[in-house]
Amino acid sequence: MMLEQQLSFGPGRQLEYIDYLDALADFLLEFQNVPTVKQKISLAQQSVRAINQGFYPPTLNAMEITSDDILAVQAAILARYPDDPEHGNQVWADQREALEQVDYCLQNIRDEFIEDFNMYAYLTPQFLTALSQYLNGRPTLEIMAGQGYLSAGLQALQPSQKLYVTDNQDWLNQPITAVQPVIDVESLSALEAIERYGTEVEVVLMSWAPDTSEIDWQVLQLLRQKYPTLEFLVIGERDGATDSRTFWQNAKLKDLTAINATRPQFDLIDEKIYRVQ
């Protein structure tokens, strides 16, 4: 497996204890003799630890426990207890239940990214590098930036690029959060930000707009009406977990396939970057 570059967004939260990692450590011990399962657990650990330490996580592939993984577990048990099928069957009963728990943890790893780090879009060094190269230093406005992970990565890759990073934190429904922005984020709504910086940039970025609001559709209408020359890039799941139905119904989309190829789908969310008109 080729090692990815390291890319930092800052000091990270440096949490001393993470429930998710504690659970994975137990599973890693249980399945240490099953390489395919062990690799997935180790990669999940690596991803969470990286974000906690202030680094963008590695590329993930499909994380669910597959039928091949199940066969590998059964083969390992058979090799361990070739002459004791009764004992082997009991071990399999225990490990089958553990596998279901592993599968749940791995397929819901994005929930961990969100709960402990407020990282919604899955941003890897490869993805950010490809996007940075595509932007090619053009002045860019990020709206609804959340904690600023996207722009922080772009800034780290190209420090001279002019980036306006904005969010009014309407998305933050919990009353208290210990997660702080990883880059300076100006408190502006999406529409306010476009009106303020629309004449100073060439690109507008929007990532993981909520599916409970039509602010994304309002943004698209504003860009079409007043700033038609701006390039509008959107990260999200078409007709899925992000953005409003109205937005997807009205947006003219171009899949940026070269950038998307750097980040395969790893969970139930088919997250992509699109150029939108």
Each PLM stretch: what is its role?
Residues 114-137:
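Conserved alpha-helix/loop element of class I SAM-dependent methyltransferases that forms part
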Residues 137-146:
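Conserved class I S-adenosyl-L-methionine
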Residues 162-167:
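Conserved SAM-binding motif I beta-strand of class I
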Residues 169-171:
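Conserved SAM/SAH-binding beta-strand->alpha-helix loop
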Residues 179-277:
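Domain-level detector for long C-terminal conserved domains
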